[in-house]
Amino acid sequence: MALKRSNFFVDKDQQLKDNLILDITDLHVNFKVKDGILHAVRGIDLKVERGSIVGIVGESGSGKSVSVKSIIGFNDNAQTKAKLMNFKNVDITKLKKHQWKYYRGTYVSYISQDPLFSLNPTMTIGKQVKEAIYVASKRRYFQAKSDLKFALSNKEIDKKTYKSKLKEIKQTYQQKIKPINVEKKTLEILQFIGINDAKKRLKAFPSEFSGGMRQRIVIAIAVATEPDLIIADEPTTALDVTIQAKVLTLIKQLRDLLNITIIFISHNISLIANFCDFVYVMYAGKIVEQGLVEEIFTNPLHPYTWALISSIPEQKDKNKPLTSIPGVIPNMLTPPKGDAFASRNQYALAIDFEYHPPFFEVTKTHKAATWLLHPQAPKVEPPQAVIDNITLTKKALQFKDQ
């Protein structure tokens, strides 16, 4: 079985441009709960370039995970609406529940924050990696046949080309699922992710590995399917700092080697700074600032971004008290009027409590939704902690370029 993708192709004027792999417009995700409607995501746009690492950062409850789970149909009982969710020129808003399986785990892989719940405790790790290879290969084979048949019926190719390509597809599939080739690929992946004595460990169960190693195995399964996109949803939260660094380095190496696109979710803005190419800052179900990682950390513009950066522990003065953001995220059953961050924002203007700010564009890639960027707004300097961080970031970037 395969998904008849021709039924889900976007219109010609909506086709992806500029090396994009994902384009989401005006995404809303609501949940019907006992006390009413929970407005988890409130009209966000996301653009993701092929081969990039895109970070989404914000406090717990800001809507990060819900946003990306909508890309793989993981939000059970959610009311999801969007003007467009274009993944590789397929509008995934049109997919029915039973159709998600043709994309999930094949074209898009998901890495959760707790590897213990991602792995089957009754199956060896070798069997789990091999299963991912077999299932993804089979789905890609049937999908390729379906797409080829569509091309023939649409007169994009002639019968001779159809037969030739069909034979090629079948031969490729048969080679991929040969047990000897699956075993070889499994060993190569496990060795690459740092599993010592991989051939022997193929028969080991998840419980025989540490938390860091289990997360590496989850990454191995995600990569084994040869996806175009990997969603890493706080994949290092349950790991200690040294293991975090190793796992992030591994993910980056896989991106560079396989040209996989990665969406990285975190509440830790310092991880985002060291790992991502492009950043979306999210608060109360909305994007409040976005830009290249260099722009966000050398010229942060939204007070919420300032607050996140200010909360990074001071490296030089270890006796300096930690900075925290006062207050809590508002109740999304009844989202506040105006800017949702206004009640926690010491720089808030009167207009913030009445009207939500539009995006003010600073560069083609950098923009922020704050009234402080309005031409008539008073000039406000960011906190000293942010200014210090900007100085350090600029020095680090200069050193990196040398």
Curated annotation (Swiss-Prot):
Classification via SMART domains: AAA
Bilayer topology annotation: Peripheral membrane protein
Protein location: Cell membrane
EC numbers, comma separated: 7.4.2.6
Gene Ontology annotations of biological process type: peptide transport; protein transport
UniProt keyword Membrane present: yes
Catalytic activity: a [peptide](out) + ATP + H2O = a [peptide](in) + ADP + phosphate + H(+)
Entry GO terms, CC: plasma membrane
Enzyme class, spelled out: translocase
Homology family: Belongs to the ABC transporter superfamily.
Entry function: Part of the ABC transporter complex OppABCDF involved in the uptake of oligopeptides. Probably responsible for energy coupling to the transport system.
Subunit structure: The complex is composed of two ATP-binding proteins (OppD and OppF), two transmembrane proteins (OppB and OppC) and a solute-binding protein (OppA).
Record-given protein name: Oligopeptide transport ATP-binding protein OppD
Organism of origin: Mycoplasma genitalium (strain ATCC 33530 / DSM 19775 / NCTC 10195 / G37) (Mycoplasmoides genitalium)
